Amino acid sequence: MLTIYAPFKNKKSKAWEVFNGVQKSWPEQVAVNDNTIATDPLSNSMFWGFVNNNLNLVRKLETRKHKFWFTDTPYFGRFDNNNLKPDNHYWRICKNKIHATYIKGCKADRFEKFGLKVKAPNFKGSYVLVCPSSAGINDYLDRPKWTEETIAQIKRYTDRPIKLRHKP
């Protein structure tokens, strides 16, 4: 059985775009619990980001070495929150981790369909762009001051201005 921990009070949350699809297609029985209620999580659980109690629930499952699924926004190809349709977005789903730790050998067409061109790094730009993760991710990684630490480290190697782009 899969147990989804979801925001019950916000059925318009993008998390439900994932969870509704999972409920329809998961090969086993699916139960949904409110992620605002502190509880002891069940093995084989699914979460969307680190909202509400999800961070604590994931940490408990990791400590016990129990299976969980972590879903969140993709690494690239953001979506339009005002125009979500079944065919115009995708999500990130990781098993027992919050990020993919390896890249499976897939055909190139899976990437090419996004129409993105990978550019070489520009080491001669006029500024350095820092794109920090959310506070929840930094807390999970035990790096609450990641942004400040990263900027301090960059300043050791360049005098170019540093610009921040927070998560949209």
Predicted regions located by residue number:
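Catalytic donor nucleotide-activated moiety binding site of glycosyltransferases and closely related
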Residues: 6-10, 131, 147-168
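N-terminal pre-catalytic "stem/leader" segment of glycosyltransferase-like enzymes
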Residues: 1-55, 136-137
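Residues that mark the start of a beta-strand
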Residues: 1-3, 126-127, 161
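A short acidic, amphipathic alpha-helical/loop segment
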Residues: 56-61, 153
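A short helix->loop->beta-strand "cap" motif at the edges of active sites that frequently abuts
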Residues: 63-68
